[in-house]
């Protein structure tokens, strides 16, 4: 952390990933300091994956003052409490996944990109019934987003042609992480609903991004989504713990019939006042993700952790 140079080195472990999106959205809101990404090693400020960070670094840095902002869909199985760190999670659900390995100072929601302010003021024509924005890990060993399942259901209901799919699996229309933020928010705005049938989400950035332009969701009513999502929920009938190559994760099970009913309900909703009401509620709820004072909060936390070195 180079306070004299007005730079804060921030550990973000990847580029084409949700953590980098959060980093850039936070960076937009910093006026006094510039955030500089560090890919390789922890720093004073960390926006990163809970499982990999805690299991790899928490015992090494257990006495190091730092800010750790974490998200993950996977259970953390071992680690050490970082007594001098400020630790934030993106959702109450992520706190559960930590299994008590590390203390948590609070829930800190990721902010949306500020292009949302311009986009929500634009008068756009809706072109898609649904947008699916979801990627699976490149090696395909962990199926968490259920993209192919989603596409199959949409085809059965003759809804595939009215759905925009941004992904890296299945017959997607656009590849993930090829759009700039303005293009992404415009496409979300052009959709009536964001559609996610994920087995679980630590937070779920695209749903929050959709809500920031008034686009509600059809979503699984569990994990982090249950904390903030607005739209048409699909209640799971059970949850199992699934072993993956990345670790253990919750798999919230949903019935095909419930998914079909929700998709058909969405198609009917856009014909009535139902849709305008959901859109207004989504926009109102998205105020929780404006985070105008994030710089002041982070700087205050820096002073606190450094004071107790």
UniProtKB/Swiss-Prot annotation:
UniProt keywords, alphabetically: Glycosyltransferase, Transferase
Enzyme Commission numbers on file: 2.4.-.-
Top-level taxon in the UniProt lineage: Viruses
Pfam annotation, one family: Glycos_transf_1
One GO MF term attached to the UniProt entry: glycosyltransferase activity
Record family assignment: Belongs to the glycosyltransferase group 1 family. Glycosyltransferase 4 subfamily.
The name this protein goes by in its record: Putative glycosyltransferase 48
Species of provenance: Sulfolobus islandicus filamentous virus (isolate Iceland/Hveragerdi)
């Amino acid at each position: 952390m180079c306070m004299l140079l007005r730079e804060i080195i921030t550990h973000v472990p990847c580029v084409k990933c949700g953590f980098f999106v959060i980093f850039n959205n936070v960076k937009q809101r910093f006026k006094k300091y510039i955030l500089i990404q560090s890919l390789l090693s922890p720093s004073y400020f960390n926006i990163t994956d809970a499982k990999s960070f805690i299991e790899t670094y928490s015992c090494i840095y257990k006495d190091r003052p730092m800010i750790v902002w974490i998200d993950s869909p996977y259970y953390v199985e071992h680690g050490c409490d970082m007594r001098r760190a400020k630790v934030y999670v993106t959702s109450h659900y992520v706190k559960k996944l930590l299994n008590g390995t590390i203390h948590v100072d609070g829930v800190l929601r990721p902010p949306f990109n500020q292009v949302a302010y311009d986009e929500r003021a634009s008068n756009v024509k809706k072109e898609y019934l649904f947008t699916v924005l979801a990627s699976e890990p490149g090696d395909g060993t962990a199926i968490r987003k259920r993209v192919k399942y989603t596409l199959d259901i949409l085809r059965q209901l003759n809804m595939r042609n009215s759905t925009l799919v941004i992904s890296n699996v299945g017959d997607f229309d656009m590849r993930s992480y090829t759009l700039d933020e303005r293009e992404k928010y415009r496409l979300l705005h052009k959709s009536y609903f964001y559609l996610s049938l994920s087995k679980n989400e630590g937070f779920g950035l695209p749903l929050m991004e959709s809500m920031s332009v008034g686009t509600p969701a059809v979503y699984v009513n569990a994990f982090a989504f249950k904390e903030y999502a607005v739209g048409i929920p699909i209640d799971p009938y059970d949850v199992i713990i699934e072993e993956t190559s990345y670790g253990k994760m919750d798999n919230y099970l949903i019935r095909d019939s419930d998914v079909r009913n929700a998709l058909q309900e969405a198609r009917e909703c856009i014909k009535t006042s139902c849709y305008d009401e959901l859109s207004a509620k989504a926009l109102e709820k998205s105020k929780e993700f404006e985070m105008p004072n994030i710089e002041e909060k982070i700087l205050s936390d820096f002073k606190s952790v450094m004071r107790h070195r």
